[in-house]
């Protein structure tokens, strides 16, 4: 399975779509890092007047920004990559050739899921590293917080769980519909419904909701593909 995943990733990196997505993400991070060059911070002085101090996002502050502000962009990028990795096989029914070579449906589903998980992890890590480097170039690395490793690990894990939940939900829709357009439309309708649900019930545990979507999507996609007629 490892060699199959490597082959899928290698094929993905040879596509123009992959580099277009990566270029757009880099441009967004670059513009945002450059655009956030300063923000107003009011500091009380002994004279009783507030003094405006100009500061910028440092490398460590950029990591926090990515964990909150850039996840929607990463999500869209991963959805496009999911379409490239899985959508083409399902919509054009190219998976039949793979199954005819002796691979079972379970094995096909597992290696596709593993490939999507690996792609999401690499994509997210790349965005964090790029943001840190650009933030450090523009404004310096800054002072590392005392609890940096703990807080960053939690933020990264939550971000990865969110990206994987979105990717799995979209993949589940692809397995159900075999239609890229229908999957995109349904996915964004579900996103809006989820946002409305959180607005109405803010006390809902978002982490639990994320893992519920992740588990349900993985199970639903597997069942849909297992019982789908060739």
Where are these regions (language model features)?
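Secretory targeting signals
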Residues: 22-85, 110-180, 187-188, 195-198, ...
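Transmembrane helix boundary and interhelical loop/hinge segments in multi-pass membrane proteins
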Residues: 82-100, 113
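Short coil/turn motifs that cap or connect alpha-helices
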Residues: 104-105
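Alpha-helical transmembrane segments and their helix-entry boundary regions
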Residues: 18-21, 98, 108, 182-184
